[in-house]
Amino acid sequence: MSSPTVICVISMLTVCSSFNLTLLHVNDVHSHFEEVSVNTGTCKDDMKQRGECYGGVSRLATYIRQTRRLDPETVLLNGGDFYQGTMWYTVFKYQPVVEFSNVLNYTAGSLGNHDWDDGGEGLQPFVDGVNFPVLAANLASSVVRGVRRSVVVRLRDRLVGIIGYVTPDTLTISNPGPGNVFLDVVESVDQEARNLKSIGVNIIIAVGHAGYSVDQQLAREVEDLDLVVGGHSHTFLYTGAPPSVEAAQGEYPTYVRQESGRVVPVVQAYCYTKYIGHLQLQFDSAGELELPVAGVGVLSARPVLLDQTVGKEQAVERRLYKYQQVLQPYRQTVGTSLTPLLKVDNQENLLGNLVADSMLAAWEDVQIAFINDGGLRSSLEVGDITGEDVLSVLPFNNTVDKIKIRGSDLLYVLEWNVAGLCPEQTCEPVEFYQMSGLRLDMEVRRDNAGQRLVRAEVRQPGGAYSDLEEDQFYWLAIVSFLTLPGKSPIGELMVESVRGDADYEVLVRYIQANSPIYQTIEGRINIEYFA
């Protein structure tokens, strides 16, 4: 079970003045310790020369140090997914995650689903090694020790409670293994907020990893919360004209009004260290957000783009260097691309087409290939592609297996895969499949989940397409993750399977054989939305 609430020694305080709180936050770092490109791919040498790279822990360290110089009691939070996503995690696992997290000196951080990718055994060294509390109020674990429901910190004689949470979907989209129960987020956070309130804590922040929709639900339904700091959905929030290529998916902060009339801000800071969220909050003596011009209790708020105007902390750069030397063999060029191969969720995209094509080419006798959007972790830029780039795209050590499945069952899988799409196109990413060898037409209406496919066609050897037949068997190339219990229906429906090569090796071979890569959108997945 999670350890009980950890609090500071509390004395009876009578506070008559307002209280200003400076808060910084990041989420979904995913082992992106080095700076990234404008599209959050690998920052190439020519991009560095042009000043077109962003983020990285050395810039984070500079910004955090500068902010703490102005306010030494600045709160720094991380919304989870410390692990997984670059070659750094593939090669070194938890070691640089612990080192650089400790360098940044977080006040607290929540667990994310990918922090469980190597099970409890892979997570425990992180929980034991970091110098800040790791939080998840909705976790009951007999496997991982030391995860707390909340922590209370004293700032200028005010008590601030911080509650963590993580998506219950962790059971199906990661690998926590037995002995871990993920409870309802809203109920768990609400109960912990009540616990904190009962011992005199009246400023309460939730930090967690369940997505923008759940963040807003928490803000709406947990009456004791003052702020929600989120993660998981990689949501970019911004008020005004965005400073880079990301389109804002909502205001920063997003203000959520409770039934009582209280307003709770919700924030998130995209991903991969490209931005850091920066808030200045003002509370009255009762712990309620006050009402300045900029918003409800918010004196200032913005996600800060960590571009070339933010210098790199040289002490952190020296720490990076010792790892970079080990990684040099992975940085050999394996091919080139003439187009940017971007990862875009919930639709056909160039990166997905490339990877699915490589999987199809890995087997001589398969007709169709699938990979889930969640299995693709980074975009590829124009120019040279290195082994490091490929590992950043496919960091999970999956194999490209071939499986045999009946056509009727394949149609069921395809319907299941798109059931989470919403007509307004505002829903968070689902485990949408990128594919090769198939052409789909579908209509997404509010009430037609399970009946969205209008047409499903399979490409024939000559290049023509014909209808997918329900009574025919098909061979598919898929990533091994999708055959695991609970990850998709495929594992239960397939009638035969053959283990293949590592997905990383498959993609490297394909790039080497087909370079320079020129990928296009081909109409493989055609979706019409009816709001």
Predicted regions and their residues:
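Well-ordered beta-strand positions enriched in small/hydrophobic/aromatic, beta-favoring residues
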Residues: 2-5, 153, 163, 476
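Cleavable N-terminal signal peptides of Sec/SRP-targeted secreted and luminal proteins
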Residues: 3-18
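Acidic, metal/ion-coordinating pockets
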Residues: 16-300, 346, 350-361, 369, ...
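C-terminal end-of-chain detector
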Residues: 1-2, 531
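Hydrophobic alpha-helical segments with strong N-terminal bias
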Residues: 6, 91, 390-391
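Catalytic centers of hydrolytic enzymes
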Residues: 19-35, 39-65, 69, 184, ...
